[in-house]
UniProtKB/Swiss-Prot annotation:
The gene is Lat2. A lipid is attached at C26, C29 (S-palmitoyl cysteine). It comes from Mus musculus (Mouse). GO terms for biological process: adaptive immune response; B cell activation; B cell receptor signaling pathway; calcium-mediated signaling; intracellular signal transduction; mast cell degranulation. Residues 171-203 are annotated as: Disordered. The keyword Electron transport does not apply. Involved in FCER1 (high affinity immunoglobulin epsilon receptor)-mediated signaling in mast cells. May also be involved in BCR (B-cell antigen receptor)-mediated signaling in B-cells and FCGR1 (high affinity immunoglobulin gamma Fc receptor I)-mediated signaling in myeloid cells. Couples activation of these receptors and their associated kinases with distal intracellular events through the recruitment of GRB2. The lineage of its organism: Eukaryota, Metazoa, Chordata, Craniata, Vertebrata. Strongly expressed in testis. Expressed in heart, spleen and lung. Present in B-cells and mast cells (at protein level). The modification Phosphotyrosine is found at Y59, Y139, Y160, Y192. It is a single-pass type III membrane protein. The chain crosses the membrane at residues 7-27. PANTHER family: LINKER FOR ACTIVATION OF T-CELLS FAMILY MEMBER 2 (PTHR15646:SF5). When phosphorylated, interacts with GRB2. May also interact with SOS1, GAB1 and CBL. This is Linker for activation of T-cells family member 2.
Length: 203
C-alpha cells in the first residue's frame, strides 16, 4: 500500500499543476481577446466619425464655393414633398386625406396601392321601412299535400308523413269499440294505460 501512496502523491500533484496551468491560460487568453475587440470597435468608431466629419466639411465647403443658384434641386424637392405629406392636414378639411402617389416620372398610380374605403361606407343612412303590402319576409303555413275537404267533421291527417299509421290506429280503435271524441283530436282522448303490465300484476 505504501508503494501505491508514493505514486499517488506525485500523480495528483502533477494533475493539479496541469489544471492550474489550464485555468491560467484560459483567463489570460480571454482578457486580451476582449481588449482586442474593444480596440477594433474603438478604431471603427473613430474612422466613421472622421469620415462623417470629412463629408460634412466637404459639403459645407462645396456650398461655400458655389454661392449662386442651386444646381441640384432634387433633395429640396424631396424635402418639400415630405413636408407636404406631413402637413397635408393643415390645408383644410375639403382636401382628401388619402391620395394616390405617383412613382418618378411614370405619372401612373402604383399598382400595389389600394384606395381606402370611403367614409360613407360606414355612415349608412336609416334603412327605409318596406311598404305595408310587402309581406315577402313574413312566414306562412305551407302544406305538403293539397288540402282535402274534411268528411263528416273528422279531421284529416293527409298532410303528415305518418297519416297511414294514424288511419290504422283510428280503425283499430273503432273495431275495439273505444268511444271516439267528436272532434277526433288526440288531445281529448283518455290517457294511455299499459294493459299488459296491469294484466301481469293481477296474476
Amino acid at each position: 500500500m505504501s508503494a501505491e501512496l508514493e505514486l499517488l502523491w506525485p500523480v495528483s500533484g502533477l494533475l493539479l499543476l496541469l489544471l492550474g496551468a489550464t485555468a491560467w491560460l484560459c483567463v489570460h487568453c480571454s482578457r486580451p481577446g476582449v481588449k482586442r475587440n474593444e480596440k477594433i470597435y474603438e478604431q471603427r468608431n473613430r474612422q466613421e466619425n472622421a469620415q462623417s466629419s470629412a463629408a460634412a466639411q466637404t459639403y459645407s465647403l462645396a456650398r461655400q464655393v458655389w454661392p449662386g443658384p442651386q444646381m441640384d434641386t432634387a433633395p429640396n424637392k424631396s424635402f418639400e414633398r415630405k413636408n407636404k405629406m406631413l402637413f397635408s392636414h393643415l390645408e383644410g378639411p375639403e382636401s382628401p386625406r388619402y391620395q394616390n402617389f405617383y412613382k418618378g416620372s411614370n405619372q401612373e398610380p402604383d399598382a400595389a396601392y389600394v384606395d381606402p374605403i370611403p367614409t360613407n361606407y360606414y355612415n349608412w343612412g336609416c334603412f327605409q321601412k318596406p311598404s305595408e303590402d310587402d309581406d315577402s319576409n313574413s312566414y306562412e303555413n305551407v302544406l305538403v299535400c293539397k288540402p282535402s275537404t274534411p268528411e263528416s267533421g273528422v279531421e284529416d291527417f293527409e298532410d303528415y308523413q305518418n297519416s297511414v299509421s294514424i288511419h290504422q290506429w283510428r280503425e283499430s280503435k273503432r273495431t275495439m269499440g273505444a268511444p271516439m271524441s267528436l272532434s277526433g283530436s288526440p288531445d281529448e282522448e283518455p290517457d294511455y294505460v299499459n294493459g299488459d303490465v296491469a294484466a301481469a300484476e293481477n296474476i
